[in-house]
Amino acid sequence: MKKLHVFGAGLSALTLAVIATSAYAALKDGTYETTAMGNNGEIVFQTTIKDGRITSVQVVNSSETPLLGQEALSELSQKIVDWQTINLDAVSGASKSSAAILQGVNGALIQAGGSAADLKSIPVFTQLQPGILPDVRTDVVVIGAGGSGMAAAIEAKNRGARVILIEKQPNVGGTTLFSTTSFTAGGSKLQMAADKPFTAEDFHRKLLAEFGEDSANLKQLADRSGPTIDWLIGLGADLTKVINDSQHVSPTGKALGTVVVPVLKKEVDRLGIDTRLQTKAENLVLSPEGKVTGVVVSSPSGRYTIHAASVILATGGFASNPDMVAKYTPQWEGYPSTASRGSTGDGLVMAQKAGAALSHMDVAGPQTVAYDTGHGAVSLTNVRYNGAIIVNRAGRRFVNELGNKNTIGLATKAQPEGVGFLIFDQTCLERGELLKKYKAQGYFVEAPTVDELASKLGIDAAGLKATLKDWAQVYATKTDKAFGRKDSIFSAINKAPFYGQKTSPANQVTFGGVTRDTEARALTAAGKPIEGLYVSGETADQFGHGVSIAITTGRIAGEYAAKHALGK
């Protein structure tokens, strides 16, 4: 593969050349790797050119901010392929990320044989007119290439099945990519080697206490979570630090999604799994007997059917679909989303049409501390897990900051203006890379004293100082009599400088989904399995914690879908 490094301040979107088909028809076929400087460092791109068209733009490596830079890269890569041009406006709030991808593709076109003269600005938008393409056949098709879908595809492939993995967005990762906290589990090798082992049974009890409803699926999640995190670590995921008994985190404080997604993507590539990006599932194919036998998909190249013995729906939840939020979780209507833009409930709709039942659709796990950057909401959950507290305008705590997400979200919603304030100190900040990165991006208000921080945030200084005095006692005794917090008590919050930020809830995780059994089979309202249809991750009805649900249930779905497809 040929490589070109693109440096400098870069061209603006308005001055970048428009590449019409006639202008680059003679470019050499191939995949070209380029780099360009984004907001948080260099970004690596791979641009594929075939038969005079840009057929793919992939982001190979990026440290851009989730929901801003990362989403801008996804959006523009799709537009470049769909419209066959790099004369595009920057995505609002992500100008550096936008400029980087336009530079990167421009560099690839030059490397493929283009010249400055070829890349002249002409207002041509050559939309590809999709046609009907030949059908394809496989054993297992996985719909959705987030954490759950990739885990399912890997498991099915390892069990001998032929697998096709499709994703409607230009990049893999889904909402898993935006997770900033931890992989919760019980019975992992690290946990069992601790002075006080934390077993799968302990984890099951913890989940039951948090969600209040037991099921065979909840027990299975607890039992399988330990082997799943062991598997991820074996693939190279650096989640080798355990905090608060159940949470596996990066020792350096990296965001969970940026650790997990690249590892899964690497394994998908190593196994040679047929991955088709910008490929949207339109509807499931059903036999006269009601079996699911495939899926009709559309891509920039055309529309076709993938026939498969097993279909896995791993399309995520519906946190980014305002209409579904209003219908199923109206308590969070009008709040922004910190989930992937692809979390629009597609799989739930398809499953219902195939006869599947939905359960617990009114239960959501909102992002409890979202910060409005002015360009979108960003999760600051990682701050809670590094020792912060949450207070209201009076400077007083009002909830267990590490409790049930829904409880925290509703408690925050009930405060004046529906907001809370994260409060923490330098000790908390120094615990991980992500908090330092957030500080550099201007996400925190900083002050040398508690009084000045309170003034900047607009909260009562006397109330905040009284709260911090109480918190010092919680830190000293590791006992929170007021709210029962037991986890992440890492700082007395007394080391200057002090930090804070106004936050509010946001839509992120939806727990309701397709009713399923412990073999991941979608069930009808009568409890009958729908042959050939499997569900995982947020698409499934499953209580638990985001990425732990995604990867664990993904592997379960991949296992049983492969067994069904291969007749085992």
Question: Which residue stretches match the model-derived regions?
Answer:
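Conserved redox-cofactor binding core of oxidoreductases
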Residues: 147, 223-302, 321-324, 475-495
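A conserved FAD-binding loop/helix module that cradles the flavin
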Residues: 326-349, 539-566
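An anion/pyrophosphate-binding glycine-rich loop and adjacent beta-alpha core
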Residues: 348-350, 356-461
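Beta1/beta-strand and adjacent pyrophosphate-binding region of the FAD-binding site
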Residues: 130-148, 164
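Active-site- and interface-proximal helix/loop "cap" or "latch" segments in soluble metabolic
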Residues: 26-123
